[in-house]
């Protein structure tokens, strides 16, 4: 059987009291396939269900969930890209969380809240509110302050360059994580070819 390392000593003590024969060993690479229990903090834990749809890391691999979670929020916001829709998602999910009627779905609701928040940020930068360009709206003091960070309609290249920079950063960051993972699995020599 398999036991999480944090309760290994308690399990050994319990088995010793029962006078049961057992051997406590560490799993061997390429021989054993121990089950995985991910240990992430609260924010990254919300994204585990998304990561699990692709693949769960092996016992020896690096868990990518905390690394892809911020990118997922940002790219979801890029795709939605509307301040109004993001605010609507935030309000609905927060109302459902506070109502405490859907406690079984709390993680999904918090995930929806953070995705909505990312959409609010990217919607502010793209300058749209339910499809209305905010650069055309006059007389709202808050908008006057935000117009400096919004993409200008005639400056489509600024949005392109920002997307390009973020994409290159994500690819390089992913390659660095792959090097760390390969070093952890096979040693630094195997990571050099990455």
Task: Describe these PLM feature segments.
Residues 1-5:
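Short beta-strand-to-loop capping motifs
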Residues 9-194:
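Conserved, carboxylate-rich catalytic/transport cores that coordinate ions
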């Amino acid at each position: 059987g398999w036991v999480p390392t944090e309760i290994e000593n308690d399990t050994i003590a319990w088995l010793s009291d029962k006078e049961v024969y057992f051997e406590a060993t560490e799993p061997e690479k390429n021989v054993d396939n121990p089950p995985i229990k991910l240990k992430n903090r609260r924010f990254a834990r919300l994204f585990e269900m998304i990561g699990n749809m692709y693949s769960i890391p092996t016992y020896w691999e690096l868990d990518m969930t905390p690394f892809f979670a911020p990118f997922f929020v940002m790219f979801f916001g890029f795709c939605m890209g509307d301040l109004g829709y993001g605010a609507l998602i935030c309000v609905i999910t927060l109302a459902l969380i506070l109502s405490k009627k859907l406690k079984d779905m709390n993680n999904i609701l918090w995930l929806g809240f953070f995705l909505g928040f990312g959409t609010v940020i990217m919607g502010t930068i793209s300058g749209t509110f339910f499809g209305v360009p905010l650069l055309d709206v006059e007389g709202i003091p808050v908008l006057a302050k935000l117009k400096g960070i919004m993409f200008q309609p005639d400056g489509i290249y600024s949005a392109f360059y920002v997307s390009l920079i973020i994409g290159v950063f994500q690819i390089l960051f992913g390659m660095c994580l792959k090097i760390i993972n390969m070093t952890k699995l096979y040693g630094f020599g195997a990571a050099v070819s990455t």
